[in-house]
């Protein structure tokens, strides 16, 4: 787990940090919450959900990198920016245990306004043509827009099999 501590006297609170380095299981998934809880207006730009230049699987012909794991559309669509560990399907997919989650920092409900948004990015060091750009940008952008602007679905932090079924149904409907 990350042992990062924030010391108030070192920071200018007029800075808006963008928290991005949060590979699943790497111990930094909660950095955005640590910053928000410390009083920073901050933006979540998670590499494990919102980087469009990550490969979506280990296919040798897939475009993108894998330093932050494999990121598919479901990772972007199913994440809850206010509680990234809320969705049990994502936790299972990335082998995140309840013991691991207990050791992480949660977003303080009184500091939720400090999480001012989410941002996606597409780094272009692996984009060598317009076709590759289109393949990496457009499907991801549609999925990201759904998460960024749509009303938070009730199942996002599901605790029952009925809610998981509803999530799966909504996911299939979104895809089709």
Listing of model-derived features with the role each one plays in the protein:
Residues 1-176:
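Substrate-binding groove of N-acetylhexosamine-processing glycoside hydrolases
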């Amino acid at each position: 787990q990350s042992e990062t501590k924030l010391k108030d006297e070192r920071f200018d609170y007029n800075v808006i940090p963008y928290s991005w380095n949060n590979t699943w299981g790497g111990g930094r998934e909660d950095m955005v919450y640590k910053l928000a809880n410390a009083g920073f207006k901050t933006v979540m730009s998670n590499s494990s959900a919102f980087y469009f230049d990550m490969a979506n699987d280990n296919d040798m012909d897939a475009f993108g990198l894998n330093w932050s794991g494999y990121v598919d559309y479901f990772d972007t669509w199913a994440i809850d920016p206010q509680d990234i560990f809320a969705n049990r399907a994502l936790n299972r997919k990335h082998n995140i245990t309840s013991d691991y989650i207990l050791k992480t920092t949660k977003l303080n409900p009184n500091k939720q306004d400090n999480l001012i948004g989410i941002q996606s990015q597409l780094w272009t060091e692996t984009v060598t043509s317009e076709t590759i750009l289109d393949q990496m940008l457009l499907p991801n952008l549609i999925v990201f827009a759904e998460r960024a602007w749509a009303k938070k679905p009730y199942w996002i932090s599901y605790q029952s099999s009925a809610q998981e079924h509803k999530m799966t149904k909504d996911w299939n409907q979104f895809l089709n």
